[in-house]
Amino acid sequence: MNVKKIYMDADALLEGHFKLSSGNHSQFYLQSAKVLEDPKTAKLLADALALQIKESALEIDTVCAPALGGLIAGFALASALDVRSIFAERVDGVMNLRRGFEIKKGERVLMCEDIITTGGSAMEAAEVVKSLGGEIVGVAALANRGFCKRQNSDVTTKPNCKLPQDIPFFALDDFTFEMYAPEECPMCKSGSEAIKPGSRGN
């Protein structure tokens, strides 16, 4: 499956000057919402990701996604795995489980994002799940920005990856674009202003 082509065909691989949810700047941005607005494409990607997970024999009770970016990917993946789908959301800047969602003690939870950069949002949501007695058994995403090592990839883990190294990380492909701290960004130095296309207000 050519994930990059799917993103390009959906006009979801954007070029410009972007501020990512991690706070870093990049010349490229993956707008997964443009890919996932087509239910057939969402199902195609989720089915491929679910196949990887099933082949690993990982046992999962629930998929949990951090809102807003991971919502559709999480639901589509849960459907493909035939398990429960829940999401965590920010309230006053802090991740919470709301809307009647509950976690049973020992419940095996797979965290899901559309894109994993450092994995910070997924791990914030994972801490909520763990605080309620859930067990984080893995992480999944449609695409990996190349900071964390996924299953079946030769990309190595970078120091700023926030995903635990003792659980599997599944993704369909690696997108290893250059990223810069704001003070080191060459586009900022040339006078360009970064725009924020994602879903976190920072």
Curated annotation (Swiss-Prot):
GO process terms (BP): 'de novo' UMP biosynthetic process; pyrimidine nucleobase biosynthetic process
Binding positions for 5-phospho-alpha-D-ribose 1-diphosphate per the UniProt entry: E113, D114, I115, I116, T117, T118, G119, G120, S121
Gene3D superfamilies (UniProt xref): 3.40.50.2020
GN (gene name): pyrE
UniProt-recorded Gene Ontology molecular function terms: magnesium ion binding; orotate phosphoribosyltransferase activity
Alphabetized InterPro entries for the sequence: OPRT, Orotate_PRibTrfase_bac, PRibTrfase_dom, PRTase-like
SUPFAM superfamilies given in the database record: PRTase-like
Name of the molecule in the record: Orotate phosphoribosyltransferase
PROSITE patterns hit by this protein: PUR_PYR_PR_TRANSFER
Similarity remark: Belongs to the purine/pyrimidine phosphoribosyltransferase family. PyrE subfamily.
NCBIfam families, A to Z: pyrE_Therm
Enzyme Commission numbers on file: 2.4.2.10
Binding site for orotate: T117, R145
Pathway the protein takes part in: Pyrimidine metabolism; UMP biosynthesis via de novo pathway; UMP from orotate: step 1/2
Function: Catalyzes the transfer of a ribosyl phosphate group from 5-phosphoribose 1-diphosphate to orotate, leading to the formation of orotidine monophosphate (OMP).
Subunit structure: Homodimer.
Domain of life, source organism: Bacteria
Reactions catalysed according to its record: orotidine 5'-phosphate + diphosphate = orotate + 5-phospho-alpha-D-ribose 1-diphosphate
Cofactor(s) the protein needs: Mg(2+)
Keyword ATP-binding recorded: no
